[in-house]
């Protein structure tokens, strides 16, 4: 079967997954916009691999009158490639609402549509009150879910989504929250496929075997680690604030912050102002999997204070207990509160500090939690299982 997968780019972590999908018998074509159209997050590392089992093609893109980017060559590429399946996400899915000719092309060539999303910042249909309990922020932590204009736009988006869902044969989603949200838009539960999110767990497991044989790289002490882009919505500032309390209870504790980004200077200044510079290490970005893996392996707990990412998966692959808040929903499929980590109250440095102290002060419990983290990655959410969920979705739509 031939699948065209439309995406903003090919993130570094996505490349191994695409390779695995091809290995399972799928002819895969990645369709990307030419150039930087502003849809890729700040600091996202992009795959530079030229050794691809999948093909890559490009389309010119343009911001349309409705305010979102569209692929100008999508129709002609579909006519030329004649795929069995088109897998597409936001905002490119909007083209099927606004462009009648595109809908006609898909119908004429009997192309099955799959909508891929988390879903993130998506309320159940008709429930604008959702945004009171779940306010939306951009990467700079600016509130975007307020005002009459936002409410009208959100209401219109609900009806557009409902129409789009009628056009698709299936949805592929990153998180099980899709089962709670999408049926309210009329989506049949059997057509909802939750694939979860994963990095290259094959490489991670291989790296771990090598690291287990190495001498220690870091001193032996209680160690908190955070990995991610240094942008505001990762809330590293809250982690540093919580660490100020943790260090009073556990004086020899160390906080390692891995990553780069626009917030580096302000976070460094915060550390200095709190007098924590002897206990906080900024490593910058680390892209050698053995070096990053050894930092994980020699740490005691992984903490994500803000918006999620695959670093949770990686930390679990190194048997670390996890502390995070509920953000985009993907973390709820990885972390079971009290079993392999804790959820802390979003935005609360006090609660975060209490959770960190609870883990660091009980090494036996921390080890049990870490073992459970590893089991989740080994058995449930890894390169093999996630790629198979794609294949299951593809087979489902082809058999309709």
Residue ranges and their predicted role:
Residues 4, 216-234, 240-243, 256:
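Conserved donor-binding/catalytic core segment of Leloir-type glycosyltransferases
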Residues 150-211, 219, 314:
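Donor nucleotide-sugar binding/catalytic pocket of nucleotide-sugar-dependent glycosyltransferases
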Residues 252, 351, 358, 365-380, ...:
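A short, well-ordered alpha-helix in the C-terminal region of glycosyltransferases
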Residues 265-286:
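Nucleotide-activated donor-binding/catalytic signature segment of Leloir-type glycosyltransferases, i.e.
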Residues 285, 292-299, 315-316:
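Short alpha-helical donor nucleotide-sugar binding micro-motif in glycosyltransferases
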Residues 294-307, 320-321:
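Acidic donor-binding loop of glycosyltransferase active sites
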Residues 313-317, 327-343:
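Short acidic/histidine- and often glycine-rich active-site loop of Leloir-type glycosyltransferases
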Residues 337-338, 342-349, 358-364:
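Conserved acidic donor-binding segment of nucleotide-sugar-dependent glycosyltransferases
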């Amino acid at each position: 079967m031939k699948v065209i997968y439309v995406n903003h780019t090919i993130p570094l972590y996505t490349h191994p997954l695409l390779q695995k999908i091809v290995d399972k018998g799928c002819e895969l074509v990645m369709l990307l916009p030419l150039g930087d159209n502003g849809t890729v997050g700040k600091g996202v590392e992009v795959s530079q691999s030229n050794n691809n089992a999948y093909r890559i093609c490009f389309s010119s893109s343009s911001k349309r009158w409705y305010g979102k980017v569209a692929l100008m060559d999508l129709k002609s590429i579909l006519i030329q490639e004649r795929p069995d399946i088109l897998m597409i996400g936001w905002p490119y899915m909007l083209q099927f609402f606004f462009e009648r000719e595109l809908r006609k092309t898909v119908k004429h060539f009997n192309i099955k549509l799959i909508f891929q999303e988390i879903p993130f910042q998506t309320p159940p249909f008709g429930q604008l009150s959702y945004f009171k309990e779940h306010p939306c922020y951009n990467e700079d932590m600016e509130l975007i879910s307020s005002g009459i204009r936002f409410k009208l736009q959100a209401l219109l988006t609900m009806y557009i989504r409902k129409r789009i869902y009628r056009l698709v044969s299936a949805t592929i989603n990153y998180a099980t929250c899709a089962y709670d949200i999408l049926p309210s838009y009329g989506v049949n539960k059997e057509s909802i496929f939750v694939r979860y999110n994963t990095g290259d767990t094959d490489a991670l497991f291989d790296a771990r075997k090598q690291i287990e044989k190495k001498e220690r790289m870091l001193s032996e002490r209680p160690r908190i680690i955070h990995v991610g882009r240094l942008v505001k919505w990762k809330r590293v500032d809250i982690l540093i604030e919580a660490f100020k309390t943790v260090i009073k209870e556990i004086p020899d504790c160390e906080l390692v912050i891995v990553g780069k980004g626009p917030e580096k200077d302000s976070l460094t200044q915060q550390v200095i102002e709190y007098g924590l510079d002897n206990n906080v290490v900024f490593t910058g970005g680390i892209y050698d999997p053995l070096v990053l893996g050894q930092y994980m392996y020699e740490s005691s707990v992984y903490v994500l204070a803000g918006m999620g990412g695959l670093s949770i998966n990686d930390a679990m692959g190194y048997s670390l207990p996890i502390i995070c808040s509920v953000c985009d929903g993907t973390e709820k499929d990885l972390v079971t509160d009290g079993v392999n980590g804790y959820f802390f109250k979003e935005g609360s440095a006090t609660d975060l500090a209490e959770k960190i102290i609870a883990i660091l002060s009980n090494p036996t419990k921390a080890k049990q939690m870490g073992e459970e983290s590893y089991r989740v990655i080994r058995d449930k959410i890894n390169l093999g299982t996630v790629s198979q969920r794609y294949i299951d979705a593809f087979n489902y739509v082809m058999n309709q």
